[in-house]
């Protein structure tokens, strides 16, 4: 039979560390003496946290920053790019990256920032602040002067989109940019930015050898730059050719639409007038001929004489002024229509010969014998 023994301090500590909250409250209630409760509470305050028996899941490694992404984040702030959104500048940034002679520097800077971020977090290592510190140190062009230093010209096409092209004398514009005569490592970049107050929480492992370093040479930079320029110029020419082909297609479609509009308009005019379209080269008359018959306007002696006689016999106010007040005029409207002029008392006229005009009265006998006009020659 095993003898009872007192537990060791390690066993007590392990027992306490593996208790739940409810069990700890129960233990506190079992201690009656105040001194013992105070000692137990002090022990709990300095006790190490409980360690789970299951192994902790390792944190997934973060993806390192891409060199092009870093280049884009820095040079997207070029002042001349400000009027356009990012989607219109992506192609331009790609062209700048293809011709940039400092891709190796950007890869090294991206590696250095990724190392800092993985240890202290992204919030404690702002990317834009990192580039503002290290890029001037490495003699990289700032965004305001990048296009001019590398010989780029910014233009705007007919659709209002930005385009870039390179001047003919820009082949040697990139020589001398960047630190071409220095050996650089990731640790060198981290040490420099920390010396200026960036990423204080990062702890550099001095015992770990650098896995990434850079040694520049002017000749290699020039060769890369020349090939990049050739590729960029070829890309620009291809884009311009595509632009011209697209404009030709649009012009052709517009010409077809205009022709259809003209044909439709001509058809509408033809239907409206029911006439054949006049030739373009012939003179168009001011008015169109009609099919209405034209009256015979040749003079007729009988009708001309009759019109003259009737118009001359109508008295005027001036001619009738000398007649008596109680006399009736020939053209008096107050006279009844069924009374013969010959039966009217005090009838007066200014005609030299009294002629019976009852045959011309409305409703007269159509078979009445017409008067003889002595002054009209017989036809």
Curated annotation (Swiss-Prot):
GO BP field: positive regulation of mating-type specific transcription, DNA-templated; single fertilization
Pfam families (UniProt xref): MATalpha_HMGbox (PF04769)
PROSITE patterns: ALPHA_BOX
Keyword ATP-binding: no
Keyword match Plastid: no
Function as written in the Swiss-Prot or TrEMBL entry: Mating type proteins are sequence specific DNA-binding proteins that act as master switches in fungal differentiation by controlling gene expression in a cell type-specific fashion. Transcriptional activator that induces the transcription of alpha-specific genes.
Name of the featured protein: Mating-type protein MAT-1
Species per Swiss-Prot/TrEMBL record: Cochliobolus carbonum (strain 26-R-13) (Maize leaf spot fungus)
Organism placement in taxonomy: Eukaryota, Fungi, Dikarya, Ascomycota, Pezizomycotina
